[in-house]
Amino acid sequence: MPLSDFQVVIGLEVHAQLLTRSKIFCGCSTAFGGAPNAHTCPVCLGLPGALPALNRAVVEMAVRTGLALGCEIRPKSVFARKNYFYPDLPKGYQISQYELPICEGGEVTFTLEGRDHTARLVRIHMEEDAGKNVHDVSADGASGVDLNRAGVPLVEIVSRPDLRSAEEAVEYLKALRAILMALGVNDGNMQEGSLRCDANVSVMRKGASELGTRCEIKNMNSFRFLKQAIEFEARRQVELIEAGEPVVQETRLFDPDRGETRSMRSKEEAHDYRYFPEPDLPPVIVEAALVERIRGELPELPRARAERYQRRLGLSAYDAGNLVADAAVAAWFDAALGAYGAGPEAAKKVANWVTGELARLANETGEAPAAWKMTPARLAAVLRLVDAGTIGGPGAKQVVEEVFRTGAEPDAVVKAKGLAQVSDEGAIEAAVDKVLAANPGEAEKYRGGRKNLLGFFVGQVMKEMRGKGNPAVVNALLRRKLGD
């Protein structure tokens, strides 16, 4: 049977690092990029006698996440010890939640190819992150353990196996990432590992009612890797089934260099971790008043914001979706629109620049909107220069890039680079006459019906004027002199 005769079934476990200043059970910093083991203390090092103390901000962020995703917030939840041995886990167990998580149920709605899909959630629970093993590839082959990340607070968001393709899994994760960023609980930085996911993948013949044996693919930190890993794993399982071989339930790792998954270890079940209630922490009691306060503080979520952009500003679903994918970008867009002007036409102009040239420049520099030298007011100034005919499209692009990189004022860039358009009819007419005189054959063909030659003439005039002619005036004069 070909792959098309099988249905892939996917559930995701998303680990999101919470944007707290300190760790979940101690006061150590959660800052990324410090010297190895600089942000540690007896608690996160797992030293004897050190006792954990729960960070209240972690609970509030978990509740905030659960409310945004439509979960039931449990009034009482319990931490548990998840027992396993690994060099980056200093205590020999991870403090997580098992039987009584803080949030249950909920769902994530996402759009794929113009259709809405919904994936149900099983639960959201709080837990601490592990450390990081660092392997030296030099001759001595030494390995070290960096425990800066140990104890960093996470929420794990577990979906039901409702996803039916790699594309659905990617769009689900994009939608969830946008929600977490809009809530201010996660920065969405997959490269640094503050948002990563495991995928549980199985296949079954279409029409079958029983799910196949699942394999878990660990720690994917990009949308591209997630898609590649699921597609490879689905093919691998189908090939095993077609060959009459069993699919072994196991944990696998995705190798991005080879584009394939490979076996890590046999898949653990809950009993393998010997969960039991954490004796050093009391139950977490979440009062109804706290839940209602947090509910009242929830921001506009990405899906609602995108719908507002489409309904009130006339933006396309594509443009609106691109803007709300990052809450900081959407806020920057709102500020730029406020500085430039209201209405669908203004919104479209601003959106085009934000999702186009500014997105390209930000991708090159890796800068978040808060660090952009191109402010909303400066973009509005560029657009007003275009509206006034001072600069054209190509000139505006040069101005935007220069302002983005240097923070110079747009009008100063126009003067310094000599980008101002020539709108004087006399100057443009002289260039038009020169071009027509140099191309009498093409002019005759145009008058004979070859109207597509207008672009040729416009290009020649702009070349003659070193790109500074006002295109509207150039077009009008050419049409008049060519007899249109």
Curated annotation (Swiss-Prot):
Its EC number is 6.3.5.-. The keyword Oxidoreductase does not apply. One of its GO terms (molecular function) is glutaminyl-tRNA synthase (glutamine-hydrolyzing) activity. SMART domains: GatB_Yqey. Keywords: ATP-binding, Ligase, Nucleotide-binding, Protein biosynthesis. GO terms for biological process: glutaminyl-tRNAGln biosynthesis via transamidation; translation. It catalyses: L-glutamyl-tRNA(Gln) + L-glutamine + ATP + H2O = L-glutaminyl-tRNA(Gln) + L-glutamate + ADP + phosphate + H(+); L-aspartyl-tRNA(Asn) + L-glutamine + ATP + H2O = L-asparaginyl-tRNA(Asn) + L-glutamate + ADP + phosphate + 2 H(+). InterPro entries: Asn/Gln-tRNA_amidoTrfase_suB/E (IPR017959), Asn/Gln-tRNA_Trfase_suB/E_cat (IPR006075), Asn/Gln_amidotransferase (IPR018027), Asn/Gln_tRNA_amidoTrase-B-like (IPR003789), GatB (IPR004413), GatB_C_1 (IPR042114), GatB_Yqey_C_2 (IPR023168), Gln-tRNA_amidoTrfase_suB_CS (IPR017958). The keyword rRNA-binding does not apply. Belongs to the GatB/GatE family. GatB subfamily. Allows the formation of correctly charged Asn-tRNA(Asn) or Gln-tRNA(Gln) through the transamidation of misacylated Asp-tRNA(Asn) or Glu-tRNA(Gln) in organisms which lack either or both of asparaginyl-tRNA or glutaminyl-tRNA synthetases. The reaction takes place in the presence of glutamine and ATP through an activated phospho-Asp-tRNA(Asn) or phospho-Glu-tRNA(Gln). Heterotrimer of A, B and C subunits. This is Aspartyl/glutamyl-tRNA(Asn/Gln) amidotransferase subunit B. It comes from Anaeromyxobacter dehalogenans (strain 2CP-1 / ATCC BAA-258). The gene is gatB.
